[in-house]
Amino acid sequence: MSWLSKLMPSGIRTENTPAKKRSVPEGLWEKCSNCGSALYGPELEENLEVCPKCDHHMAIRARARLNSLFDPDTATTEIAAQLGPVDALKFKDQKRYGERIKASQKASGEYDALIAMRGTLKGNPLVAAAFDFAFMGGSMGSVVGERFARAAEVALEVGCPFVCFSASGGARMQEGLFSLMQMAKTSAALGRLREAGLPYISVLTHPTTGGVSASFAMLGDINIAEPHALIGFAGPRVIEQTVRETLPEGFQRSEFLLDHGAIDQICDRHQLRDRIAELTAMMMRQPHPQDADAA
């Protein structure tokens, strides 16, 4: 330290005095994956992870999704929350499956990729489930299938509609056939709901692929998709390499699927709550829904 620096007040810097680095809290700013805009984290969260600049629907966590659906300040009950995955096959690729489970649980704060809850939507009972893509890409293993089936059973017991928000890369390869059998298990659970005359609404979000798209995600009485969501069994690059042809622009996006009759409608995330409330009330032959706090 020079003699001049010793005489200078602490708040004044000379040209050669290094500036102190200011620490920015992690997650305070996020970058839109579509337009590249820098977005203030708390405001983005309040906007349901939709970019205010370009309206791009970014990934949203499962609990945030469900909290935005159910009536505020009302009790919700989580279904099969105690279930956690096990490495029954002692599977190992670059890492052991058990290590991947622990890492995903630590990173996401969840035991597995599907959260299911029972609550009310504008005063009417509802069971809903949502995928958390932050847990191993929302892959479907035994716990996901069991939670989905139990959620359908709760809807059957209560006599209410069931809604599922899908965001998944498909079946979890580390569980082998245990994962693939969940396709049949979840489809059978929906069959029991159908026999009881209870509606099931499937909401397909980005991305919905693999075994999830080939089972319960496309079995809704009404299939709704968020804008520009990737929906399909195999990805477009895999299909192009297989058929050796260039795919049409927008292939497998929700708008393409709507134009070709594969889904029923596209709904902005901000309007999903009202849309689901209207549809479930109509299908259950209930009065037009009103907000719980306005009733």
Curated annotation (Swiss-Prot):
Residues 28-295 form the CoA carboxyltransferase N-terminal domain. The keyword Lipid biosynthesis applies. The keyword Transcription regulation does not apply. GO terms for molecular function: acetyl-CoA carboxylase activity; ATP binding; carboxyl- or carbamoyltransferase activity; zinc ion binding. Zn(2+) binds at residues 32, 35, 51, 54. Its cofactor is Zn(2+). It is found in: Cytoplasm. It comes from the Bacteria. Pfam families: Carboxyl_trans, Zn_ribbon_ACC. GO terms for cellular component: acetate CoA-transferase complex. A zinc finger (C4-type) spans 32-54. SUPFAM superfamilies: ClpP/crotonase. InterPro entries: AcCoA_carboxyl_beta, Acetyl_CoA_COase_Trfase_b_su, ClpP/crotonase-like_dom_sf, COA_CT_N, Znf-ACC. Pathway: Lipid metabolism; malonyl-CoA biosynthesis; malonyl-CoA from acetyl-CoA: step 1/1. GO terms for biological process: fatty acid biosynthetic process; malonyl-CoA biosynthetic process. Binds 1 zinc ion per subunit. Belongs to the AccD/PCCB family. This is Acetyl-coenzyme A carboxylase carboxyl transferase subunit beta. It comes from Xanthomonas euvesicatoria pv. vesicatoria (strain 85-10) (Xanthomonas campestris pv. vesicatoria). The lineage of its organism: Bacteria, Pseudomonadati, Pseudomonadota, Gammaproteobacteria, Lysobacterales.
